[in-house]
Amino acid sequence: MHFDHIDYSNKYIQEILYIIRLGIQKRNKLCRNKREVLNTQSLVDTFNMIGVTMCETLIGAQKEHEREDGRGKEDIYFYLNDDSYTRIFFAEAKRLPKYKTESEEEYVVGKSSTNNPSGGIERYKLGIHGNKNLRNNGMLAFIENKSVKEWLQIVNNKITKEFPQDSPLILTDNTNEYTSVHTYVNHEGVFTMYHFWIDLSLTR
């Protein structure tokens, strides 16, 4: 089965944002001491329930979109309920701070144990995540220490340092929700990132 069938129209973006916002509001199973993959799975289960029962368009959500080219996989993908399981939105989840650290982050840039790029925004810019023709992508952050304000300053300072041509995260009308605009590294064009930050600093 072909799993890289993508709808580039971006016409479902508002429904997807609704699903994510509502899913985060129902985040009763998320906590700081859980592994990132378990918190992500809990969110995905909620996103999927909302997408197939509460939206005009049937939109599913699953973990780990496997690419046919084997270059990488996103933590979360949203898809249409059609014969091709058409992908319409990708999202990457990151812990703040990085696992087993107090202040490091891989939200903007980073290196994996095999010296490959591991930063969330970085991987979208390189085309490892997302698709150059799909101009809207997502990031979720699980805030486990410090305040949202402190992490916002850290992340925006890193964007300014590493990618001065890109915009910082800008607060929307929704709490802990941001947008930013980025250029691609290897080809022309820009894309918008939708950021959803979930404060788990007071949970156990």
Regions found by a protein language model. Name each.
Residues 46-49, 53, 67, 72-74, ...:
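Predominantly extracellular/lumenal beta-strand repeat domains
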Residues 76, 89-97, 124:
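Conserved catalytic cores of phosphodiester-cleaving nucleases, focusing on short active-site segments
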